[in-house]
Amino acid sequence: TACQNHMTHVSQRDMKSTLALAGSNRDELERVLEHYQDDPQKLAAARYLIADMKDNYYLVSDGIDSVHAALVTTSLQEGFLERNRRDRWMAYRYEGTAEKIYDAQTVSAEYLIENIDLAFESWQRYPWGKYYDFEDFCNYLLPYKIGDEKPDNWRRIYTEKFAPVLDSLY
């Protein structure tokens, strides 16, 4: 489609930047592209995701890691964050103390392939998917994260946990 062609053109320029930034992890990103070479739509999605990755990073520091561990433990045990714990997290300042790690330098091919496949599965499985064109899919459903968090398997976790609920709604 015209949208895919436009995105592929834009992605070529940005993808080169991402692949250069990836350094020794470049092979992982190229494996994703090779994996989808026979599926034009998933290949276009992979190109979009990799091109968009050039500015994605997460921060690492002892302070962030300890606060994150406390938040994860709390949310898993209690199902919500107490106000004082949330306020401590929001007040935490890590500027200058954290190391910036670019996703392009660390994400694996397996991680990106799983993310792409699960995003397509959700888009095609549920009736609401027909209201989203490919550009909307790439912008809103495909991304593997929404901020500066470390990439994780959130999509797999949420799919396994909530698919039965979603299936019962449709």
Q: What function would you assign to each model-found segment?
A:
Residues 4-170:
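N-terminal accessory/pre-domain segments preceding catalytic cores
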